[in-house]
Swiss-Prot record:
GO biological process: mitochondrial respiratory chain complex III assembly
Membrane keyword on record: yes
Site feature location: Cleavage: 70-71
InterPro entries cross-referenced by the UniProt entry: TPR-like_helical_dom_sf, TPR_rpt, TTC19
Primary role: Required for the preservation of the structural and functional integrity of mitochondrial respiratory complex III by allowing the physiological turnover of the Rieske protein UQCRFS1. Involved in the clearance of UQCRFS1 N-terminal fragments, which are produced upon incorporation into the complex III and whose presence is detrimental for its catalytic activity.
Mapped TPR repeat ranges: 127-160, 220-260, 269-302, 308-341
Protein's name in the database: Tetratricopeptide repeat protein 19, mitochondrial
Record has Isomerase as a keyword: no
Single GO cellular component term: mitochondrial inner membrane
Organism: Mus musculus
PTM (free text): Proteolytically cleaved by PARL.
Consequences of knocking out this gene: Mutant mice show progressive neurological and energy metabolic decline, decrease complex III activity, increased production of reactive oxygen species, extensive astrogliosis and accumulation of ubiquitinated proteins in neurons of the thalamus. Compatible with a Mendelian autosomal recessive trait. No evidence of embryonic lethality nor evidence of obvious neuronal loss.
Pfam families: TPR_10, TPR_12
Keyword annotations of the record: Electron transport, Membrane, Mitochondrion, Mitochondrion inner membrane, Repeat, Respiratory chain, TPR repeat, Transit peptide, Transport
Amino acid sequence: MFRLLRWRLGRTLLRAAGRRCGGCTARLLPERTGDAGTGAERLRTRGAPARGHGVLPLLAALAWFSRPAATAEQPGEDASDEAEAEIIQLLKQAKLSIMKDEPEAAELILHDALRLAYESDNRKAITYTYDLMANLAFIRGQLENAEQLFKATMSYLLGGGMKQEDNAIIEISLKLANIYAAQNKQEFALAGYEFCISTLEGKIEREKELAEDIMSEETANTYLLLGMCLDSCARYLLFSKQLSQAQRMYEKALQICQEIQGERHPQTIVLMSDLATTLDAQGHFDDAYIYMQRASDLAREINHPELHMVLSNLAAILIHRERYTQAKEIYQEALKRAELKRDEVSVQHIREELAELSRKSRRLT
């Protein structure tokens, strides 16, 4: 009755992670400075503002899964005994505490749940609780602790007979790769991403041979998991300045998301923005503008929660194309929207960009 958590525990968790661990959140990429095509342009994450007209990548798997995959059973109300019912209630309380950004309370509750799971010898409950504890440690930036907990979760799953290519194992492997990426353990990170991507691609090829006319939910979730792995790998390659490789990964991830989720899905828009960021970093400003303009149009249509960030990115690309007046207008709109969202990080960044743009304009006159 226990389902492993999806990669995202919801947008609230990602926001909480961003507040608590700027460089080691679910977004993972620390601030970086480097030459990007035409000069010293800065690529950085939302959590790490930097001076200069840099594009702000919308990093993270915001909503790859629009619904949970049916890889295991979810905790329900039909607990078979009192101990399991109590464990389920504790896990629900812990998840609620996490969503309310109360990690200390969640940790205490999870330890109680784990104790009960061991006392009742409930292997599924033990596995589920370890996974939730690992996710909590990860979003708090406790990477070494998260690593050990994820490995413990994987050990329990494999020990219970789960196959190595099961989506749940791939998700944990992806989380471990992201931890290694945050720790700048390049060899381990890239090996982890390669394992996840190659395993899923092989799995999808085998499933194609048995494919029916209508894609099953399980197959769709496998595609989405592959897209999430490509997305994560692309972010790390972008951070590592392997820009052309990052571009290819983003292109594949975007194609998957468009096909499965649709062009208007929030995650599709995020990927368009990230791909534009990567193109911009290589000096491909015209191509970057096409993707970012489309992303901003779609973000307006669906009232995307991070429209202000897309607009900020669009303005940065307009500056690179020397369209300063239009860039200023877009930045001003982005600033108003960021203030309404009370996104202090973006507000600070956009104000700095506007100030820099003003100085640049004075030098040109």
